[in-house]
Amino acid sequence: MSGQGPPPSMTPQQQHMLMQQQQQQQMMRQQQMQQQQMQQQRQQQIQQQAQQPYQRARTPQMVPQGGSPGGAHLQMHPHLQPQGQMQPRSPLVGAQLQAPSSVPTAANPTTPQMMQQQMGMNQPMSLPPTHVSRPGSVAPPSSVPVNLQHTSGAPGLPGSQMEHQYPMHLQPQQQTLSRPGSQQSQHIQQPGSIQRPGSVLAPGSIPPGGPASQTGPQSIQVFGPGSVQPPGSTQAPSSVQPASTFNPGSIQAPASQQPPASVQPPPSAASGSTVAGAQSSKEPLKPNEEQIRMVQDPVDLVRNLVQKDLRNSLVEMNKRGAELVRQKQEGEVNEDGKAQYSRATNDFHAVCDEIDRTLTTVLETAKQLSKLDKVFFDRSSRDLDGEVMVNSVQNFVDNTEIVQRMFDDTIGSVTSSMESMRRRQKKWEDQHKNDDVEMME
């Protein structure tokens, strides 16, 4: 199709579009051929290096100096790895790395389909090239292209996934088997290196700052200090280690969990130890009469009022009344006696009003409880689910709001009708008054 020219009946726009499609198809074919060549070269290199025996260390102490202790811990415990990277561990991890001298320079993808295909195969948890620290003596040669990481993520290449998954878990035996100019020098930390890049499995914890910020991920603190730090000289200096280990005993309760200082129970119900612990720095506030009545039971409050306050006020009122009657019989009525009797009468009436309000509150509460008992349809099980209870109460509140809105609308409609009627009546009266004035003139 590429050798044939466009038919003469096509317009120039159609011919231009056809030429663009042919060019895109040719570029896609070239990219596919390059990917096939890369796959064949990698398979040949795997067959050559598969004969080199090596022994993988099984202890966290074999982590190279300057490596990531978190990576070694996750290597020994694969069940702690994220779900997106739980892949079978292959013995050919070190052998699947390709020498940069045999890697051809890949063309940049120009079509959106190829760009999405190449970028979609890369591991989402892999580190970008700028976050991997390496000494200057093992820098990769200039023949390695910058977009090698993108081209290695082509479909059908198992080495690309393992290369991004285990770059920081290679053991010292694998360093001796790698060739001097291979790509492994980009990921292995030498013993003389000071920087410690974080684990590839948790790149989100590595800040994009300088070398001091790449000492280790903070998400490995939950495993304990013994399982994430290698012994000896491979440990990080004290200036870059975490501030404190995971010790539940050292965690203090926040101040918000302590009882507030503004709300105090009555003296009869508060314990001395609780008040002393909560108000160690400040003097406890003395509860006034309103706070005491707020925390008391209404029934107990009525009982106390009847047994104490009502009796005392009644006795005081009778005493002042008898004194006033005696003074009246003697003919010497004192104004001070009248004031004391009035004060005693007011106190008695205040106690009676308080008892009336409290009993009214108790009765209204009992009515509301009887309504709520009808709301909960299932009263057989004592342990009701919180969600079911909230939904039932919410339905009751919604229905009550609907009824209240109906009353408000009715009252508002009647009020507006009365206002409009009065405005018309006033207007009619003003108009007839003007007519009467004109007739009189």
From Swiss-Prot:
The keyword Ubl conjugation does not apply. The keyword Transcription regulation applies. GO terms for cellular component: mediator complex; nucleus. PANTHER family: HOMEOBOX PROTEIN BARH-LIKE, MEDIATOR OF RNA POLYMERASE II TRANSCRIPTION SUBUNIT 29. Belongs to the Mediator complex subunit 29 family. Component of the Mediator complex, a coactivator involved in the regulated transcription of nearly all RNA polymerase II-dependent genes. Mediator functions as a bridge to convey information from gene-specific regulatory proteins to the basal RNA polymerase II transcription machinery. Mediator is recruited to promoters by direct interactions with regulatory proteins and serves as a scaffold for the assembly of a functional pre-initiation complex with RNA polymerase II and the general transcription factors. Involved in development of gonad and seam cells. This is Mediator of RNA polymerase II transcription subunit 29.
